[in-house]
């Protein structure tokens, strides 16, 4: 057999992330996305406090 022996093989090293040069448009776009995500999260929290919207009305029993 080859030189490799039993056991777990070492994982390959991931390349280091380099800082990207972002243009002003990219920075504005990221900021806008973060603000929208924050708004959606706040709206979801408000909706969760109220409880279910449906559930009223006449409930039918299974009997006939």
From Swiss-Prot:
Residues 53-64 have a biased composition (Gly residues). Residues 1-64 are annotated as: Disordered. InterPro entries: TMA7. Keywords: Coiled coil. Residues 28-44 have a biased composition (Basic and acidic residues). Residues 21-50 form a coiled coil. Belongs to the TMA7 family. PANTHER family: TRANSLATION MACHINERY-ASSOCIATED PROTEIN 7. This is Translation machinery-associated protein 7 homolog. The lineage of its organism: Eukaryota, Metazoa, Ecdysozoa, Nematoda, Chromadorea.
């Amino acid at each position: 057999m080859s030189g490799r022996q039993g056991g777990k093989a070492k994982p390959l090293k991931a390349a280091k992330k380099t800082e990207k040069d972002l243009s002003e448009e990219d920075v504005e776009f990221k900021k806008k996305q973060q603000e929208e995500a924050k708004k959606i999260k706040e709206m979801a929290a408000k909706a969760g406090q109220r409880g279910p919207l449906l559930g009223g009305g006449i409930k039918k029993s299974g009997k006939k």
